[in-house]
């Protein structure tokens, strides 16, 4: 048997709860795998065989102690703007689709998703399935493939997760359960109230009332916790809080920012601020231009807002600047698009590196990589090798400039301007620590990275086990 985790809304903590359950089951010797039929996210991961899936499912696979694979997230939607998304099907880019046309093909997609779930079950036994958004989107019941349609096909016991932090938890839970179709409502076996703040004893009556009005056991009141695992979507950027740290790094919060999880390890060591285009960049110790799902349109926003000139000014002042993936492409002199990434045309980049990027075909590079650092400059000399992954359309032709890593990327003569396609550069703690050390050295500061002596997935599992009656969930896996 397996379990399905649905939510009363987006950002209630489904992904984190699934990751915690995957680790709890693993610690009890129960083989399991995560599964999410359809995910909409610009944060993605590359599997060992070059497939692309949502980063949440990769994170959950790590919690379960198994390698991520494309069956864990067979349908990934990557928004490009103008109500258009790229469909990534079983890890490969399939086609772009307008929102009003997507639901015309969901029957076929549900079949693909169920086949993927079946393969995972035959391989690992149990599944911990994650729904998408809110479960009670009644206007989508007839075509939904992530919540109701999937629940109807799988018939797994359902755990409903609610977010008390945003308020209205009674309406969230009661309303969601009441609105579920008659054949789905009996599958709801447990409710978990997430993101609680304060003394749990003060909500004991609330848990009792939830059980009385829904007839469903309320098995957990889980306090807010700061566990160091990747975020899934851009809503989490709203929750990030700036902390006091020896250095301050600006990450340009592009309208279509992707893979912002690249910088979450840096947040352990530095004050990382996600600043929107138009925000003054003076005073930062480093600037990062991140990835984007639409390089051209976000580049136009960077230029129109004045941020492009701010970045150029920072370059003349010797501020370290790093462009990753789409940010790397923006640093180029010129971008040629045949209508693949955005509209057709030739566009001027920021002109900080002598390179040209070309989008000429509907082909995407998705690959895990390990590369040797060139060792050129005060940052790259601190690291020997790096591991990460590439996810990008287009190719960049390097001009008269040094290579940053073996076979990829660029670095300026002074070593302060770096462009690379490598996502995950800073998710390696030794690279993130080396970058912060480099920035501290420039300020004459002595800094030592703090030790992390416990697996964050074990920390998460311990936290959930302390506040959820796990013994009421375990029978679902017999």
UniProtKB/Swiss-Prot annotation:
One of its GO terms (biological process) is cobalamin biosynthetic process. PROSITE patterns: GATASE_COBBQ. GO terms for molecular function: ABC-type vitamin B12 transporter activity; catalytic activity. CDD domains: CobQ_N, GATase1_CobQ. The active site is at residues 325, 423. Residues 246-431 form the GATase cobBQ-type domain. Pathway: Cofactor biosynthesis; adenosylcobalamin biosynthesis. The keyword Magnesium does not apply. The keyword Endoplasmic reticulum does not apply. Pfam families: CbiA, GATase_3. SUPFAM superfamilies: Class I glutamine amidotransferase-like, P-loop containing nucleoside triphosphate hydrolases. Keywords: Cobalamin biosynthesis, Glutamine amidotransferase. Belongs to the CobB/CobQ family. CobQ subfamily. Catalyzes amidations at positions B, D, E, and G on adenosylcobyrinic A,C-diamide. NH(2) groups are provided by glutamine, and one molecule of ATP is hydrogenolyzed for each amidation. NCBIfam families: cobQ, PRK00784.1. This is Probable cobyric acid synthase. The lineage of its organism: Archaea, Methanobacteriati, Methanobacteriota, Stenosarchaea group, Methanomicrobia. The gene is cobQ.
